[in-house]
A protein has these predicted regions:
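Long, highly charged amphipathic alpha-helices
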Residues: 13-20, 66-69, 228
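Structured loop/turn residues at beta-strand edges in well-structured enzyme cores
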Residues: 27, 48, 77
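Conserved nucleotidyltransferase catalytic core and NTase-mimicking acidic/glycine-rich helix/loop elements
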Residues: 14, 114, 121, 125-245
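Residue-level preference for long, well-ordered alpha-helices that form the structural scaffold
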Residues: 6-10, 63, 218, 225
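Helical scaffold of the NTase/Pol beta-like nucleotidyltransferase catalytic core
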Residues: 1-33
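Catalytic metal-binding acidic patch
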Residues: 33-69, 81-87
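Conserved NTP/Mg2+-binding pocket subregion across the NTase superfamily
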Residues: 3, 9, 65-158
Length: 245
C-alpha cells in the first residue's frame, strides 16, 4: 500500500540516499519504495535498518558497481542494501516468491515513480505451496538449530531472537491465504493468527519479549519455548497441507 504515512525521521534518513540515486540516474529508475518494519510500530531506530526496493527499467550492472561503494556510508546511517528488481523480473517471479511479493504489496511506501506493487496479483495456489514449503523448512531449521546450540543457553536464546523476524512474513501470508486481512505489527499478527487458526502463539510472544530484551529466560524455559515453537509450526503445517486439497 502506498498510502502509508512515512514518519519524518524515516524520510530524513532515507532522502539523502534517494537524492544520490535520482541526481544522475533518474532515467534508470522505474520506482523506489521503502518497505518493511520502517513503516510499522515495530521499527526501532536504534537497531532497525530502513529496507527499500529499487525497480530499474532494465538491470544495469554498471549502475550497481557505481552504487556499491556508497554502501558503507549509508549503511552506517541505517540504510540497508536495497533489493534491485525490474518490472520483467517481478512479473516472472511472482509464482516463485509469492510470500515475498505479497509482503511487499502489503507494506510499502512509494517514494519515487509509479507504484508497481499496489495491484500486483498473487496466485493463491502459489502462495499455499510456498507457505507449506516454508513451514517444513522452519521445522528442519528448528531441529538443527536446537541441537547445534549444544545446550548453551545464550546461543539458544540468541537463535530464537534472531529467527523471530523471519516468521512474520510467513504468518502474514498464512493469514491472507486463509482469507483475512493481515495486520502489520508483530503482536497483532500473532493475535490474529491465533484468532483465525485457534493455534496459540504464546511462545512467539515470549520470543518477541526476548528479542526486545525484556526477559532473560532460563534454559528450562527455553526448552519449553522450543517445544511450543515446534508444535505451533507443526500444527500450521498440517493445516496448510490440508488447505484446498
Amino acid at each position: 500500500m502506498s498510502g502509508l504515512n512515512l514518519k519524518a525521521d524515516i524520510a530524513d534518513r532515507y532522502n539523502p540516499f534517494l537524492e544520490v540515486l535520482l541526481e544522475e540516474h533518474q532515467n534508470k529508475m522505474h520506482s523506489v519504495y521503502i518497505v518493511g518494519s520502517a513503516l510499522t510500530r515495530d521499527y526501532d531506530p536504534k537497531i532497525s535498518d530502513i529496507n527499500s526496493v529499487i525497480v530499474l527499467h532494465e538491470m544495469d550492472l554498471k549502475f550497481l558497481e557505481m552504487l556499491a561503494p556508497l554502501g558503507r556510508k549509508f549503511g552506517k546511517q541505517g540504510i540497508a542494501a536495497p533489493l534491485f528488481m525490474t518490472p520483467a523480473y517481478i512479473d516472472n517471479s511472482r509464482d516463485v516468491f509469492p510470500i515475498e511479493f505479497l509482503n511487499i504489496k502489503l507494506l510499502h511506501h512509494t517514494v519515487f515513480g509509479q507504484d508497481i506493487f499496489r495491484d500486483l496479483d498473487i496466485d493463491r495456489a502459489d502462495l499455499r505451496h510456498q507457505c507449506e514449503r516454508e513451514l517444513k523448512v522452519k521445522l528442519i531449521g528448528l531441529r538443527q538449530g536446537y541441537v547445534s546450540a549444544a545446550g548453551d543457553r545464550k546461543i539458544l536464546a540468541t537463535g530464537f531472537a534472531d529467527s523471530f523476524a523471519g516468521y512474520m512474513p510467513l504468518f502474514k501470508a498464512i493469514i491472507v491465504l486463509l482469507g483475512h486481512e493481515s495486520p502489520q505489527n508483530n503482536p497483532d499478527i500473532l493475535s490474529t493468527l491465533t484468532d483465525i487458526t485457534g493455534i496459540r502463539t504464546d511462545a512467539f510472544n515470549q520470543v518477541l519479549a526476548l528479542k526486545n530484551r525484556q526477559t532473560k529466560p532460563t534454559m528450562e524455559k527455553l526448552n519449553l519455548v522450543f517445544e511450543d515453537y515446534y508444535e505451533i509450526i507443526e500444527q500450521l503445517g498440517e493445516m496448510i497441507n490440508a488447505f484446498d486439497k
